[in-house]
């Protein structure tokens, strides 16, 4: 071989070596969907789960990124229970199509017309290997198919079995659906919200199971030639020791997506758990458009909302540290005091002094934010309100804490954060959020949150530019909870009334708030859960909002 030919040969060899792997050998698609039964979205932040956190941070393996949301949602055409959502996570369609509307109906599901994503892959021309693992007995009928192996067992046993499959000489399944059930069991026995210690412990144990799976996958000798998609979600959350209720506690779920083609960041809007199987099918090259599925392919687009200075859009900041309440927000709203017995500058506030509002029936004592009848809000309905509230063990009626609506009818335009009754125990007061809608239902009610009587508790409401209402609570023990709702897109917040603290928009509601308020703030824009959590955590460290505005 002459010198010139040697140069040409060497150049060609070098070019081949430098080609992307996709040009030399196509990466083999693999997918794992994990459903953690009963996992609330806020559990991800309140409970230490290092393996999930590593995934969320995009630090699992080189080349893999993560998209995540703290405001995922489950199906809406059935109550937020296990069987309907399990069927949706398996098939990518909601209850109207798969016909599982409640627990006990799985055996009669319409899975011939709407098979699972595993069955679609198992019967594809590629005949992908599949596996379904579960612990709840009813799942034996969840989209059952003869070409999809099913395995029932306890969560740790199923995890170990799946690890053995992934480590086997034949490489195990290409596509796996793993339902983990013990978190739900702990919620039922000891409590979903507030997070019971057993619920916390079981979530940590679940994280260990997932960590073993991640390590096993990364240790595969073929891992470098594989293209993994790992999707983690939940079927429902819970309140007290139950789920199935409307109002957000059982609807708000986490969604975590990890893969080479995922964009690092926060998923926009209100993604659904039934987006998971559709995204997994697309990962294997399946054209999902003709399938008429209800879920969508997600994970490549993330939220473009940029964090803004906290003082931007601030309309009111009332620390209530002086006898005459003052709005210290620059160019903020004017305020007026209604009543003779409402007092500002009262000792014993959360951060310094506070506002004390006398309660009772036919009492008119409140703070009016003047000229807010037709307040200009970003995107017509975006706003954020934060406050610390101390309520007594009992109160009369369902008094407004902050409102701009005629609260005599919850379907009327406007909103209210109000004292209400606990869902399970009518003698224990709670707090909930209501807003009017243009829709036929005319109202949405979020919550209820339990209170710790005579303790300072943090509350926040925000409506984001992506059409999500988020209602948050920060408890004295440091736990930060949130629930979400997407019907705010058709909210009717223009009541033509002022925004008032301690009363409804008319300032004449029959039941006046009895309680204390500290460090109240209002913005004409939305915020993220992360921002609201930071305000709460600062307050727990005795730093008022003013210190964050500097």
Where are the language model's segments positioned?
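Extracellular glycan-associated modules
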Residues: 307-550
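Non-catalytic, well-ordered alpha-helical segments in soluble enzyme domains
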Residues: 269-303, 524-525
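Metal-dependent active-site segment of extracytoplasmic phospho-/sulfohydrolases and closely related
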Residues: 33, 51, 205-246, 280, ...
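Active-site His/acidic residue clusters
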Residues: 138-150, 162, 166-208, 212, ...
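Histidine-centered active-site microenvironments of extracellular/periplasmic hydrolases
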Residues: 231-261, 486-487
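Short, structured active-site-proximal loop/turn typified by the sulfatase FGly-forming signature C/S-X-P-X-R
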Residues: 42-84, 92, 315
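Active-site-proximal N-terminal segment of extracellular/periplasmic enzymes that hydrolyze or transfer
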Residues: 24-61, 332-334
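Long, well-ordered early-domain segments
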Residues: 52, 59, 81-138
